């Protein structure tokens, strides 16, 4: 039986309203100071890990109580995750740091079917969540009261530069074909693809963060956490397989002309990086201010190509979410997705593949993106993304795909997993499920709960009350 342990983080239950403050996410004009309360569900006698597989926080937003449900982002790192930096004399130093008990989560707000959350719990709560259609950011305050957090609407972050920022991909870069309805749009989990992503940080970005590699790593991990959330609606799973920081000097000529930088980075990946580290796609993060308001550039329809499965990204904002959306956008081009047009829809929200970054944060791919991505995958069949990467958060080696091994009922996780026993790979007493869009606190969500919002003129998908998966609506167009 699962016991619920209430841990009161702070006795203060009321928010404090502030007018202006400088935070890691930027200058914020209007914010609340809040004190989250943590509610932890752990099985009786279980050893509590540093970061639990599932957590709940009670907090106040606009003075109203909300409950934030969080689940650890399993598979965020590949089994062979590595980090590389360079010594002052130019020697390459590569390590395989332990990342099993990481602190990155996805989640939702209780009683808000359209809510999402992407949170780092490494040092307090830092990230974003969507509540009643509005995007909020949360981060710890550096005060003597260490449990205080600031929560604020994304729209209250001062814009660092009012000039429009855009993707450098144009029709000259794309292989244009008219958008059409794909016959394979009715996808199932068996179609899932897996991308092992490698990220490179240039020397300028290393210096921008004062040589603080830990801060850079935390930023990168949270941005990939956000990317992974966005791509799950395309049935694509992303795992970070490596980070390389050019701590001594740049390994290529990083210049304001994005096309030249992308070409150089692609050559370096093909002749150097791929010879020492297997991965599917690589992105270069740079502090360089690209010309013509460009903040990212990628080759179109190039996934798995040794040189062209690459992108370059300008670290253009202090807000993790904005840079993560740019990374997701450029990866989309590698997957054959073009810029959205007026006929594309994200259910009333801004779309990730818009050619110009919007002041309304984009969190979703459009109906057009969904069709184009799977048109590319089915026609070009990029082989490198067929294999499921080994995860770091398992006790025993996980089986490939969605099927479990003989006698297994769930994917083995950490010992603190409240739903799945990490030793036996069986559901714990009282648990119906361990993961899935229709699994909440180890139980199937009730029939009729929206598990996947519609894109464009399509229809919502609903839980059926008897399984953890999110079945496709049979009335989809």
UniProtKB/Swiss-Prot annotation:
Superkingdom to which the source organism belongs: Eukaryota
Domain (Peptidase M12B) ranges: 193-389
GO molecular function, one term: metalloendopeptidase activity
Subcellular location per the Swiss-Prot or TrEMBL entry: Secreted
Residue ranges occupied by any Disintegrin domain in the UniProt entry: 396-477
Coiled coil location: none
Stretch forming the signal peptide: 1-20
Disulfide bonds: 304-384, 344-368, 346-351, 410-425, 412-420, 419-442, 433-439, 438-463, 451-470
Positions bound to Ca(2+): 196, 280, 384, 387
Family statement: Belongs to the venom metalloproteinase (M12B) family. P-II subfamily. P-IIa sub-subfamily.
Protein name from the UniProt record: Zinc metalloproteinase/disintegrin
């Amino acid at each position: 039986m699962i016991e619920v342990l209430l841990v009161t983080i702070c006795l203060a239950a009321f928010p404090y309203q502030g007018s202006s403050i400088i935070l890691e996410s930027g200058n914020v004009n209007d914010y609340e100071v809040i004190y989250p309360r943590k509610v932890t569900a752990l099985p009786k006698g279980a050893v509590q890990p540093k970061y639990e597989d599932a957590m709940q926080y009670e907090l106040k937003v606009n003075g109203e109580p909300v409950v934030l449900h969080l689940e650890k982002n399993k598979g965020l790192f590949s089994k062979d995750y590595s980090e590389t930096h360079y010594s002052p004399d130019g020697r390459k130093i590569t390590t395989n740091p332990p990342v099993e008990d990481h602190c990155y989560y996805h989640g939702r707000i209780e009683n808000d079917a359209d809510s999402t959350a992407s949170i780092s719990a490494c040092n307090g709560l830092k990230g974003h969540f969507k509540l009643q259609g509005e995007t909020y950011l949360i981060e710890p305050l550096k005060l003597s009261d260490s449990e205080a957090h600031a929560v604020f609407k994304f729209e209250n972050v001062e814009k660092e530069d009012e000039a429009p920022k855009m993707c450098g991909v144009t029709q000259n870069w794309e292989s244009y074909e008219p958008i059409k309805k794909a016959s394979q749009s009715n996808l199932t989990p068996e179609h899932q693809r897996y991308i092992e992503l490698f990220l490179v940080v240039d020397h300028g970005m290393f210096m921008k963060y004062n040589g603080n590699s830990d801060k850079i790593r935390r930023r990168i991990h949270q941005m990939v956490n956000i990317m992974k959330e966005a791509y799950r609606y395309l049935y694509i799973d992303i795992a970070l397989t490596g980070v390389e920081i050019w701590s001594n000097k740049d390994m290529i000529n990083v210049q304001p002309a994005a096309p030249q930088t992308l070409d150089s980075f692609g050559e370096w990946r093909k002749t150097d990086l791929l010879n020492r580290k297997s991965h599917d796609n690589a992105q270069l993060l740079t502090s360089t201010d690209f010309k013509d308001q460009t903040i990212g550039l990628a080759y179109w329809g190039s996934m798995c190509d040794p040189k062209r499965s690459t992108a370059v990204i300008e670290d253009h904002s202090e807000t993790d979410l904005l840079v993560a959306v740019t990374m997701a956008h450029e990866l989309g081009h590698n997957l054959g997705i073009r810029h959205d047009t007026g006929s594309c829809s994200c259910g009333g929200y801004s779309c990730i593949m818009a050619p110009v970054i919007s002041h309304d944060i984009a969190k979703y791919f459009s109906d057009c993106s969904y069709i184009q991505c799977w048109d590319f995958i089915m026609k070009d069949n990029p082989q490198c993304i067929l294999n499921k990467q080994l995860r770091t958060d398992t006790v025993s080696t996980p089986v490939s795909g969605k099927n479990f091994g003989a006698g297994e009922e769930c994917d083995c996780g950490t010992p603190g997993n409240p739903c799945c026993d990490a030793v036996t790979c069986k559901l714990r007493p009282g648990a119906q499920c361990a993961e899935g869009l229709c699994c909440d606190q180890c139980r199937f969500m009730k029939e009729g709960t929206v598990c996947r919002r519609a894109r464009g003129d399509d229809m919502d998908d609903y839980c059926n009350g008897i399984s953890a998966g999110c079945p496709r609506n049979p009335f989809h167009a």
